[in-house]
Every structure is written in structure tokens, then in C-alpha cells.
Amino acid sequence: MSVGCPEPEPLHSLPCCGPGAAPVPGAGVPLLTEDMQALTLRTLAASDVTKHYELVRELGKGTYGKVDLVAYKGTGTKMALKFVNKSKTKLKNFLREVSITNSLSSSPFIIKVFDVVFETEECYVFAQEYAPAGDLFDIIPPQVGLPEDTVKRCVQQLGLALDFMHSRQLVHRDIKPENVLLFDRECRRVKLADFGMTRRVGCRVKRVSGTIPYTAPEVCQAGRADGFAVDTGVDVWAFGVLIFCVLTGNFPWEAASGADAFFEEFVRWQRGRLPGLPSQWRRFTEPALRMFQRLLALEPERRGPAKEVFRFLKHELTSELRRRPSHRARKPPGDRLPGSLRLEAPGPLKRTVLTESGSGSRPSPPSVGPVVPVPVPVPVPVPEAGLAPPAPPGRTDGRTDKSKGQVVLATAIEICV
């Protein structure tokens, strides 16, 4: 690798499913071979930081790195420098995330990266545009949800981001509010971020350790040894759960598995075996319920494409119940599933993270405590004006879990080996 060169290399496109992956027609992501690990990353000394960059503040940190908001002294341009600890990630995984993010940056609904990629002695580093309003999770009132107009603006943009990705045969695999960055708190401008788990359609991946409410049932059921083939349906499912969350301020279930009473009730409704609606779905209008039936179809092949939500957005999604305090604290008598002792609803939203056991994987964020020390922002010339993101906005990767004091770094967990 080149050492001490002041100019960053242009961003390269890398395999999204491991070394030597075959090209995907129309995918828009040029694929290289194992030589990707020989790509030049500029090695820079942290001592030069004050020469080019001003540290504004730390945006977040975790066991595998940190994110700093910096300003380039020459122009005042703000950017988020993302430091990934070398002891917690492989070079190929870091380069893959940067490459995929760059390849998708032509979409106005996907976070952009600056032409700044380098390494320090302890970290790999790249720069993203800064989203000043934080992430979508930050603005969702627990057990209340966002105003419907705000939700529709957000859903429209996310649908376009997913449609763009899926048209290139890429699957995000970690759709959730924490990975949607905001440029204003009314969701007039939002962008999808965090592509560390992104893989192309058909790529076979290992199952993660544990599940989160956004995880599709076929992923929950996949064997750890066999894994599963990546499909756009996992994004569509997570998109449906996300829409439920932003409208209600609650999860629909804790996990899409038979052990969850609320998911089982939903399954019975989807299969026409439940008279009436599950209690937590009664606030939605008929068009909204049809939308959820499509997005959350139990069989992946029956899920509609993400862009199908557009035809439902012209309708009201929630009824008058939406304007009342959450009525999900307890299920009404008679709504309990046979043989189930569980009465409490899944509860208000909380931040979620996936983990994978095995070398090279990124661990779950710590409850509290210091992170392995990482260098302060390193001087790299700011990109040309034409490459800089428009009026870059706030946090791109770091965030704090307000409910539990957890520090969460938004980089998605590496899963595919």
C-alpha cells in the first residue's frame, strides 16, 4: 500500500458477495477478483489532523470504531469520518461497504460518500455526507408514531431507494429506522445508509446470531449451517415492519417466529384463520391492511416489490384510533391465542443490532464503556466540489440508545463470508 500520499484514491467497485464473484448483468457494480485487497489505501498519520480538518464533535462510537463530524478547513465542508477498527473487520469487508455505497450514490435517496478512503495504523476510514437531523429512529414518538403525512414522505423516498437497489440486483439486508438518515425532522429529505450487509441477489450467506423484529421469517427459520440465498424479499419484509413502526411507535412483534404470540396471531390472520383483525392492526384502514398483506406476505415469492407501496400512499393509512394513545398495552379479553400466557405487547421501539459469531465479524454494540482507542480524524483533501454531497447533513453512523444507554454504531454487521 502506498504510504503518506496526500491525495486519496478514487473509489473502486468491489465484489458484493466475496472474492471472485461473477458479474451480474445490469447490477451496475463492477466486480473484481481477490486482487481487491491490494487496492491502494493511503496510510496517513493522525498527527496531521489539524492541518486539514477541524474536529467538530464525535458523533458516536462502539466496540468496532467511531464516527467523527469534521470540517475541511479549506472550504468548511462538513463530513462524517467513519473509523472502523482493523481488529474488528476484514479489509475486504470494509472495501466492499465503501464500494457498494459509492456505486449506489447516484440515487438521491441513498447516502453519498466522499472520495476519501484511507487507513491509519489502527483503523480503516472513509467519509460520508453528514445528515444533521440524525436518523429516523430519533424522531419516532414511542407508542405514538409519526404523523401520517411525515410517514408517507419518508416511505416514498425509501421505496425509491429500495427500488433503485433492487433494480441493480442488490439487497440491503438491514432495513430499519436506525439506517435511515434525515436531513430534516419532517422527512422531506431522507436517505438510506449502512451497506455493510448488502449482497447481491442469489448470494448464499450465513444466518446471523439472533433476530430482530425486522428479520423476515424465512431468515429466522434458516439453519445456521446451511444459511440461505439472499433475495429482495427480505428487504420488502423489513420495509413493511418499518412502516408499521413509524406509524405506531411500536414493534408488531419481537421476532417473526412461532415462539412469538403476536407474530403467530398475525400468521393466523394472513392465512384467514383468525376472525377479525389482530388487536395491534385494528388502527389501520383497509388500503393499509392490503399494503401490509403484500409487504408482509409469509412466502417471499408472494411479496410485492418495494415500489408497490406507492399506490397505497394516496389513501389514508390509519383510522381515528391512530390519534388516541396506544391501545396495545394489553390485549383485550378474547384476543389471546389459545395456550398462550403472554398478554403484554412487544412494547415501544428500541434500537436493534444483529451480530454474527465467527472471525472477522463485527460484535454487537456495548452497553456502556469505552471503545478501543482509535485515532482522531485524519487529514485528507476534501473532494472536488462536484463530488461533495449537497450541503452535507448529520450523523451518518453513530448513535446512542437513549433507552438503555447503549452506544450503537450504525455500520451494518458483516455476515457473508
Swiss-Prot record:
Pfam families to which the protein is assigned, alphabetical: Pkinase (PF00069)
Domain Protein kinase: 53-318
Entry keyword annotation includes RNA-binding: no
Catalyzed reactions per annotation: L-seryl-[protein] + ATP = O-phospho-L-seryl-[protein] + ADP + H(+); L-threonyl-[protein] + ATP = O-phospho-L-threonyl-[protein] + ADP + H(+)
GO molecular function, one term: ATP binding
Chief place where the protein resides: cytoplasm
InterPro entries: Kinase-like_dom_sf, Prot_kinase_dom, Ser/Thr_kinase_AS, Ser/Thr_kinase_Sbk1
SUPFAM superfamilies reported in the protein's UniProt record: Protein kinase-like (PK-like)
Region (Disordered): 321-405
GO cellular component terms, semicolon-separated: cytoplasm
Compositionally biased tracts (Pro residues): 363-382
Keyword Kinase set for record: yes
Compartment annotation: Cytoplasm
Binding site for ATP: L59, G60, K61, G62, T63, Y64, G65, K66, V67, K82
EC number per UniProt: 2.7.11.1
UniProt keyword annotations, A-Z: ATP-binding, Cytoplasm, Kinase, Nucleotide-binding, Serine/threonine-protein kinase, Transferase
Family statement: Belongs to the protein kinase superfamily. Ser/Thr protein kinase family.
Job of this protein: May be involved in signal-transduction pathways related to the control of brain development.
Protein name: Serine/threonine-protein kinase SBK1
